[in-house]
UniProtKB/Swiss-Prot annotation:
The keyword Methyltransferase does not apply. The gene is lepA. HAMAP family: LepA (MF_00071). GTP binds at residues 14-19, 131-134. Residues 2-184 form the tr-type G domain. Its EC number is 3.6.5.n1. It catalyses: GTP + H2O = GDP + phosphate + H(+). Pfam families: EFG_C, GTP_EFTU, GTP_EFTU_D2, LepA_C. One of its GO terms (biological process) is positive regulation of translation. It comes from the Bacteria. This is Elongation factor 4. PANTHER family: TRANSLATION FACTOR GUF1 HOMOLOG, CHLOROPLASTIC (PTHR43512:SF4), TRANSLATION FACTOR GUF1-RELATED (PTHR43512). Keywords: Cell inner membrane, Cell membrane, GTP-binding, Hydrolase, Membrane, Nucleotide-binding, Protein biosynthesis. GO terms for molecular function: GTP binding; GTPase activity; guanosine tetraphosphate binding; ribosome binding; translation elongation factor activity.
């Protein structure tokens, strides 16, 4: 036990977490040089393509330290993106310490701060590491001061390394062996094992990643899931060295994987406690706080035959991704599907892409919305996550929208641009502090504005230097309206959006123009209108395609021409009564891009 070290690597996006973990694996000889690949832990295709870490991964390595002792390192590589912060908090719950990796060129960023505070709240030992010192732009002295100034941990003797070239990585390992405490726990007590993560394997069923807090887990033990009371048999267990390696025993303080032939996806929820059936622990371990989804969107299969497959896929994915929320929903325009809750737009994109890739589905997504709090005239409080569920305007006493507290860190020269952007997004400034060349800004901005495109716009106004961390604070009363889209006087429920009355006119007009470009021309006029209640605020028409019926008349009598035109007109009129309009997938996504390219 004294030789075990459990730690995570936390950092902002692109500060070199995954590369550093590659080097640590190489030094400890977890893989032969032939098996080594760049970012060996980012095993999903999607992670490799986008160059980001999405799922936290764990590895167990043996390291012979300079003091001659053999240490067992269990470490978990975590994502840096704000949308995946729950992955980070789950990983940290299984550790005693964390490496805080900071890019020596870019310095401290908002996400570094947020993840570091999460670690400090859980009483972990945080070891600062300055990475990328091989870059010409690196200023380790300045960044060390910045860490002290902004984060508040002593970084004067922070380890300096370059994960890419491998300089100083040995020192990083030595430092963490010294500074991070050994796990606490008692191997003689009843078993308590925390489920950190689980995923679905087509051959093995549910595979869980567990951290043994007390007791020991042996192969063949009968184990009990504490929240459901179900009893299973521990068929196989082992560790990752990134490869799966079977073991017979997982000792106290270790992190490993476990297969016990659970077929049911809800059999072993993440954050649950496992114990022995014959001598159960008295109380479960404190799990993780449930993450509330911030963004909701409807997901519908393109062909309704895929509905069953889609439901299974969502089930398997939600096992692997504890923050995904979903419930069945039906729409008159799109048929049956699910209303899903996500942590942010990136999370939504990733989930949609994983569903389409890993499960071969074709999906249509409706525009994302946030949750609104509605007080009706009969003084009931409702929570509405989709525009179509909003009660009629005259039944609403008060509509409250969620407000997000946004912490931004940016260089001084971009301050003006960023403040302009925040004001445009209806933000209210609550705090501003200067740290050397950096400015820390705090704004309260409506969640709806943050999830739409705030992050992208923030990056582009600051040339990528600003960083953002946001969290939900409260609901605040606001003048919101629902804008409906009518196509040939029929409401399309999937296209409705909730927006602030001040922006409604503009958003409505923009959306209608966008739809006009996307809907293909038919044999009759298509009227596209945006309306608030019964009040039309914008309209445009997709013009009909007309055959030139007069082409065959040479000169001749005007009444002949009139007759032909009249006949065409009547035909068009009849067509319009029976014709219906097919909306392309792009049309549903048009709402996302309203107000982006102005």
């Amino acid at each position: 036990m004294k030789q075990i070290r459990n730690f995570s690597i936390i950092a902002h996006i692109d500060h070199g977490k995954s590369t550093l973990s590659d080097r640590i694996i190489q030094i400890c000889g977890g893989l032969t040089d032939r098996e080594m690949a760049e970012q060996v832990l980012d095993s999903m295709d999607l992670e490799r393509e986008r160059g980001i870490t999405i799922k936290a991964q764990s590895v167990t390595l043996d390291y012979k330290a300079n003091d001659g002792q053999l240490y067992q390192l269990n470490f978990i590589d975590t994502p840096g993106h704000v949308d995946f912060s729950y992955e980070v908090s789950r990983s940290l719950a299984a550790c005693e310490g964390a490496l805080l990796v900071v890019d020596a060129g870019q310095g401290v960023e908002a996400q570094t701060l947020a993840n570091c505070y999460t670690a400090l709240d859980m009483n972990l030992e945080v070891v600062p590491v300055l990475n990328k010192i091989d870059l010409p732009a690196a200023e380790p002295e300045r960044v060390a001061e910045e860490i002290e100034d902004i984060v508040g941990i002593d970084a004067t003797d922070a380890v300096r390394c370059s994960a890419k070239t491998g300089v100083g990585v040995q020192d990083v390992i030595e430092r963490l062996v010294k500074e991070i405490p050994a796990p606490e726990g008692n191997s003689d007590e009843p078993l308590q094992a925390l489920i950190i993560d689980s995923w679905f394997d087509n051959y093995l069923g549910v595979v869980s990643l567990v951290r043994i807090k007390n007791g020991t887990l042996r192969k063949g033990d009968k184990i009990k899931v504490m929240s459901t009371g179900q009893v299973y048999n521990a068929d196989r267990l082992g560790i990752f060295t990134p490869k799966r390696v079977d073991r017979d025993v997982l000792g106290c303080g270790e992190v490993g994987w476990l297969v016990c032939a659970i077929k049911d996806i809800l059999g072993a929820p993440v954050g649950d406690t496992l114990t022995l059936a014959r001598q159960p622990a008295e109380k479960p371990l404190p799990g993780f706080k449930k993450v509330k989804p911030q963004v909701y969107a409807g997901l519908f299969p393109v062909s309704s035959d895929d509905y069953e497959a889609f439901r299974d896929a969502l089930g398997k994915l939600s096992l692997n991704d504890a923050s995904l929320f979903y419930e069945p929903e039906s729409s008159s325009a799109l048929g049956f599907g699910f209303r899903c809750g996500f942590l942010g737009l990136l999370h939504m994109e990733i989930i949609q892409e994983r569903l389409e890739r890993e499960y071969d589905l074709d999906l249509i997504t409706t525009a994302p919305t946030v949750v609104y709090e509605v007080e009706t005239t009969s003084h009931d409080t409702l929570y509405v996550d989709s525009p179509s569920k909003l009660p009629p305007l005259n039944n609403i006493e008060e509509l409250r929208e969620p407000i997000a507290e946004c912490h931004m860190l940016l260089p001084q020269e971009y301050l003006g641009n960023v403040i302009t952007l925040c004001v445009e997004k209806r933000g209210v400034q609550t705090n501003m502090v200067y740290h050397g060349k950096q400015v820390a800004l705090t704004y309260e901005i409506p969640m709806a504005e943050v999830v739409l495109d705030f992050f992208d716009r923030l990056k582009s106004t600051s040339r990528g230097y600003a960083s953002l961390d946001y969290n939900f604070t409260r609901f605040q009363s606001s003048d919101m309206v629902r804008v409906d889209v009518l196509i040939n006087a029929e409401r399309v429920d999937a296209l409705a959006l909730i927006t602030h009355r001040g922006n409604a006119q503009y958003r409505g007009r923009e959306l209608v123009e966008k739809m006009k470009e996307l809907i293909p021309r038919q044999q009759f006029d298509i009227a596209i209108q945006a309306a608030i209640g019964n009040h039309i605020i914008a309209r445009s028409t997709v013009k009909q395609l007309r055959k030139n019926v007069l082409a065959k008349c040479y000169g001749g009598d005007v009444s002949r021409k009139k007759k032909l035109l009249q006949k065409q007109k009547e035909g068009k009129k009849r067509m319009k009564q029976v014709g219906n309009v097919e909306l392309p997938q792009e049309a549903f996504l048009a709402i996302l891009h309203v107000g982006k390219d102005n």
